[in-house]
């Protein structure tokens, strides 16, 4: 009597998400085993500590072999050694390039060089993130920067194409690349209240409106470099505060429009000229690299802190900035409306994001 037996052979690579997270977080095999034991996995599965140790080591070996492919994610999709379902490939890539908020705040705006890498020991101690994880995150930032810094086209699209990241994560990396390239200061004490999300929001606005790519999508380094011609032209805005008649008329237009609508009207009326000088002088100084780097320091010093000290609610800040920007269009002696809109459209969005405790 003969019997038929169907045999299926599979070699799908198994990915344990919890172990992958421990590996990404920089834990050693022994530390990972201890954490898995603490989670109650032995009771749940009936396994022994020896089996758990072996399982963890197997996963770590797999992740180590996958890491070189994760450095160039399209290679992971096209390799034939590991049979990994597409959904798992996406998870591996996305989590490998995910970063800690506390870590990115320490390196945002710094040069992605060996000098900064030497500081990772201190950053690890300060943030409580393992040194191994800090190195992975820093190397990811540097790798993405090196690949896309010279490319034409949309920064976000280039990152997505070469690293297969989700739209949100690609936008975050675009902000990191943009800040590293322009070396914006983010570490000063008065900026510590700002989150990475605050800076990333502003980066996206600046990329959309202040870069070379905002006016010409065929320009090299389209979304990475600020438009130098635009920054030079911003000096023309100085007339708004240098010309006393224009300054007085601007103030009159804003006060007339906001009387009875602003809870802090008297404070606004008293400080209008100082606030306007602050915002216009920030623009006029952006021809110098140092002043570009200090943009966020200046915005907090010249606008956020004065308004905060007078207890402006966010709703009043929004009303003021809207009217302050729009009223310029009624100044007959002013000839740089398009330049003003390009500057203030972005600045208004940034200031509203920066204005919080």
From Swiss-Prot:
Membrane topology: Peripheral membrane protein
InterPro entries reported in the protein's UniProt record: FIBP (IPR008614)
Top-level taxon in the UniProt lineage: Eukaryota
Compartments where located: Nucleus; Endomembrane system
MF terms in GO: fibroblast growth factor binding
Keywords, comma-separated and alphabetical: Acetylation, Membrane, Nucleus
Residues with PTM N-acetylthreonine: 2
Gene Ontology CC: endomembrane system; membrane; nucleus
Main location: nucleus
Chain's role: May be involved in mitogenic function of FGF1. May mediate with IER2 FGF-signaling in the establishment of laterality in the embryo.
Complex and partners: Binds to internalized FGF1; this interaction is increased in the presence of CSNKB, suggesting a possible cooperative interaction between CSNKB and FIBP in binding to FGF1.
Name of the protein this chain belongs to: Acidic fibroblast growth factor intracellular-binding protein
Species: Mus musculus (Mouse)
Taxonomic lineage from the root: Eukaryota, Metazoa, Chordata, Craniata, Vertebrata
